[in-house]
Amino acid sequence: MESSASSPPLTQSDPLEAFPRRTLEAGDIAVLVLYFLFVLAVGLWSTVKTKRDTVKGYFLAGGNMLWWPVGASLFASNVGSGHFVGLAGSGAAAGLSVTAYELNGLFFVLMLSWIFLPIYITGQVTTMPEYLRKRFGGNRIPIILAVLYLFIYIFTKISVDMYAGAIFIQQSLHVNLYLAIVGLLAVTALYTIAGGLAAVIYTDALQTLIMLIGALILMGYSFAAVGGLEGLEEKYFLAMASNRSGNSSCGLPREDAFHIFRDPVTSDLPWPGILFGMSIPSLWYWCTDQVIVQRTLAAKNLSHAKGGSLMAAYLKVLPLFIMVFPGMVSRVLFPDEVACADPEICRKVCSNPAGCSDIAYPKLVLELLPTGLRGLMMAVMVAALTSSLTSIFNSASTIFTMDLWNHLRPRASEKELMIVGRVFVLLLVLVSILWIPVVQASQGGQLFIYIQSISSYLQPPVAVVFIMGCFWKRANEKGAFFGLVLGLLLGLVRLILDFIYVQPRCDQLDERPAVVKDVHYLYFSMILSSVTLITVCAVSWFTEPPSKEMVSRLTWFTRHDPVVQKEQVPSATPPPLTLSQNGTPEASGTNTQFEMVQENLSKTHSCDMTTKRSKVVKAILWLCGVENKGKEQAPSRADPIIVSLEENPLVKTLLDLNLIICISCAIFLWGYFA
């Protein structure tokens, strides 16, 4: 067969081995080590350069980030190892329909800065649960949301990225899985703890460049190996495992592999689900997810946030060419491994009887690239893994510190919040390591589809609550709460059913209940959104309307309302802490001052004890950004959160023009591959 003949010769190893013994050579290791040193240098530089001794300095990078690091961080936070492995794997298994997720995300990352971000800015929020607390009042919605976000981060984002990175790292280096993961997590946590969001954004900017260079090089090698896009279209439909049973349809390429819009009933991604069901989780991710929104809140002003979103949107065009198409090429070059159809053979190839499409990208790297470039692509995968993990670590730490810990300890000092945020990162690392065996046992044949199905069960209710809060002034706390709870309960029921009734292999009879077998997860997303929307509207309409202060400057239609001095309102969570002139944390809008732990320590320890403090202790305090500065060096006042929506007219015009160009490019790609 032509596709098999074009495969590079395997080294002396088991022909069924997914990753031959051809491993990284000395040149590859040198590139990888230099990359690590460079990234750590950038992280340490940003650690020294930026303000880290305030809540905003650590969690929002001081609110002074320019458009290009914001855009690079948005892209790098989204495109992790799960994208490289998952998108390429889905491309190999089912064609380019999975590209719809990337093109769909392009629209919503722009919607974030043009529509949602102005509301968040005028509302002066740091986290998404904080927005809901201000918009609806009470604590039950923000607490439910905070716990849900942490659940999603730990058990889908972190675990998926670690599993995807492990596929590449373990097989290319032939080292113990846990040793590789623990080492990566240690480096990742180090500059996340030390530098806060500034270190994350600066390293994301560097790693975005590394990812794009390496992925573009591999794309060139991939298309050259199959004769370009025309050659891929011809050879992809011939890419079948040589040991496939002749009477079975298992392992055959899909006839609609080069189309995005597919049959609404029998296909793997029905077109109504792509247009509507996919949009709800996409809106949650790009417009209300803490990981993404936190990057735009760190921008210098609204124009820089829009510029960052535009940069990320332009980059979202690339995954089709640097991930999906290379995954399809990998199937053409290595059909016996990537396109294996027999469960026993797949088990020998990749230890997964459901299929081995997820090895498509690592297989391409290890077999196609020469020495040196393999090391560069290894660095790209490590960059993707660390970028995604640092973003999640920092954002999850922000939610835990500002929305849960601050609720439990309303009088927590600035210093305590800093320490708690860093310690929580360490706990995330521990939980992530313990979750690795579960991830290994639960992954199916297509990692990316697993991610999206889980998202479709948990994210739509949250997205609907945010939409109603931002665009319907009549929505109140009772409606949002009952809509959120009902939606999450239905989503959890479907999630549990999916785990109980596992999707059968191609050669097995599907005996699952109709609600699982016949209702596609994208259609379920539409149903879940509708139920939540109806519940929010009905309950809100028949209960009391929200107060004026819960609407003013917190919806799209009231974002330009004048700032009103609020009366003292009892709240379980105090307003954000800032630093007063004498260095003590001061609650915004009140005269209450809380003593810092540093001042309490100074009452019990003499100046001599301070000067004789262990160098190790000083180093730890500096790492946490809470080092003792002495009375003559009181911490400076934290920069105020941006509240102005004013933009330079010329800059605004250029941004709007680029918005039109970017959307036009996306519409063209939708139409070309539809």
Swiss-Prot record:
Coiled coil: none annotated. One of its GO terms (molecular function) is D-glucose:sodium symporter activity. Residues 567-589 are annotated as: Disordered. Keywords: Apoptosis, Cell membrane, Ion transport, Membrane, Sodium, Sodium transport, Sugar transport, Symport, Transmembrane, Transmembrane helix, Transport. It catalyses: myo-inositol(out) + 2 Na(+)(out) = myo-inositol(in) + 2 Na(+)(in); 1D-chiro-inositol(out) + 2 Na(+)(out) = 1D-chiro-inositol(in) + 2 Na(+)(in); D-glucose(out) + 2 Na(+)(out) = D-glucose(in) + 2 Na(+)(in); D-xylose(out) + 2 Na(+)(out) = D-xylose(in) + 2 Na(+)(in). It holds the Pfam family SSF. The chain crosses the membrane at residues 26-46, 57-77, 103-123, 141-161, 181-201, 209-229, 273-293, 309-329, 375-397, 419-439, 447-467, 480-500, 522-542, 654-674. It is a multi-pass membrane protein. This is Sodium/myo-inositol cotransporter 2. The lineage of its organism: Eukaryota, Metazoa, Chordata, Craniata, Vertebrata.
